[in-house]
Amino acid sequence: MKFYLDEGIVLKGSDFGDGHRMLTIITKELGKIKAVAYGAKKVKSKKRGALLEFSRTNIYLRQSNDYFIVEQAEGIEYFPNLYGNKDLLHAAGQIAWLTDRFWPLGQLNPKLYNWVLYSLRLLNSGVWPKIVLRNFELKLLAFTGFRPITTHCAVCRKPYRGEVWYFGAGEGGIVCPSCRPIEGIYFEIFPEVVKGMNALLLASPEKLPELLLDERVVDRVKTILEYFLGYQLGEPIRLL
């Protein structure tokens, strides 16, 4: 029987029998895991507060055949502002949902782990949710092997010089007019949108609050990412 001490962020939880919780947790050392917290729904349980959705927690785990069992949990960091604001709570939920869909069980992804944490902190501190979400979505794609090509044509590799081009999900990024097929779904993409995507891709957590982007640009990035993320998942999705 193996035991582990790890740090994790709770993405989601559901009822599991009488008074128990089945949790999806991303961790530093074990990757994404499923874990049962026995008795976590009970009012007097010490695990209850430490295993709230979106909390950062030290967890002592025991491995069973099908999942991990949470023996002990100690909260490290909470984001109280998320729970008092419906829009922020939904934004955090979208981050958790996308992370769960793109992060396979048992795989390590320290860069994505850190960016989930950064994004929750930014939401909790009052940074514009739309810009936090677009930044997170682009970083998610980058850290899971789907970073969109935004500096040159994804087909012929012609450098982008600020013209009106197109974004193709199948090509994985921007496509020049000469390479755009007649058929298929392509999004017209203007220079300010390409510039905005690159700024969001490169922004650090410290610089993101200072990033000034027109809301129309942010909304256009959302439209493109909504289709691109859905394309990678194999199903249409809706972003906030």
From Swiss-Prot:
Q: Where is the signal peptide?
A: none
**InterPro entries per the record?**
ARFGAP/RecO, DNA_rep/recomb_RecO_N, NA-bd_OB-fold, RecO, RecO_C
Keyword DNA damage annotated: yes
- Please provide an example of a Pfam family that matches this protein in its UniProt record: RecO_N
Q: Name one GO biological process term.
A: double-strand break repair
Q: Does the UniProt entry include the keyword DNA damage?
A: yes
SUPFAM superfamilies listed in its UniProt record: ArfGap/RecO-like zinc finger (SSF57863), Nucleic acid-binding proteins (SSF50249)
| GO cellular component: a single term | bacterial nucleoid
Record keywords:
DNA damage, DNA recombination, DNA repair
Family, per the entry? Belongs to the RecO family.
HAMAP family, per this entry?
RecO (MF_00201)
Q: What does this protein do?
A: Involved in DNA repair and RecF pathway recombination.
The protein's name is DNA repair protein RecO
What species is this protein from? Carboxydothermus hydrogenoformans (strain ATCC BAA-161 / DSM 6008 / Z-2901)
